[in-house]
Design a protein with these regions (language model features):
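A loop-to-helix transmembrane entry motif
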Residues: 35-40, 57-76
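Hydrophobic alpha-helical transmembrane segments of polytopic
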Residues: 7-17, 70, 77, 99-107, ...
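N-terminal signal-anchor transmembrane alpha helix
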Residues: 6-38
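Cytoplasmic juxtamembrane interface segments
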Residues: 1-15, 63, 133-146
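Luminal/periplasmic active-site loops of membrane-embedded glycosylation enzymes
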Residues: 41-55
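Juxtamembrane loop-transmembrane helix junctions in multi-pass integral membrane proteins
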Residues: 2-9, 55-61, 65, 90-95, ...
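Juxtamembrane helix-break-helix junctions at the cytosolic face
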Residues: 78-97
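Alpha-helical transmembrane segments of multi-pass integral membrane proteins
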Residues: 105-146
Length: 146
């Protein structure tokens, strides 16, 4: 298959994954439970214990609000990724380089923060799959340039 198509579709898949993750955080009633094990480990208490305190009665609503905004931004990033990775647009070498630079920065920092802050999260596995996809894109980019 054509390297440009492989590059483009792989980036589109990364963007689609971002959109799906963002939608999950926006639509789930208790989004903090999507990664319960890592969150409980980080908090060093259960959510039940956290929410039982009188001073934390409004915390679930606040967390829901924060996760909704987070989901919105993840969806927006996914849409940008998809918008700039169509086969026609990625014919531009400069655009491919900028897309790879931005994605690389996002993936590197996401991997570092994930391992540092929530190492037991199941999202770590997804990050590594996305990193492998990103490396595949770099390989395809290099093939296009030859």
């Amino acid at each position: 298959m054509n390297s440009k198509i492989l590059f483009s579709y792989t980036i589109i898949i990364i963007g689609t994954v971002m959109i799906l993750l963002g939608a999950r955080w926006m639509l789930v009633d208790e989004p903090w439970m999507l990664d319960e094990v890592a969150n409980v480990e980080r908090l060093e208490m259960t959510f039940e214990e956290l929410f039982n305190s009188e001073s934390n009665k409004t915390l679930p609503g606040y967390l829901k609000q924060i996760y909704r905004f987070f989901g919105y931004w993840v969806i927006t990033i996914g849409l940008f990724i998809i918008s700039f990775s169509t086969p026609k647009l990625i014919e531009s070498n400069d655009l491919r380089k900028r897309l790879l630079l931005c994605l690389g920065f996002m993936m590197l920092l996401g991997t570092i923060l994930g391992h540092a802050l929530i190492p037991s999260s199941h999202f770590i596995y997804l990050v590594w799959i996305m990193n492998a996809s990103y490396l595949f894109c770099i390989f395809q980019h290099n093939k296009i340039n030859k």
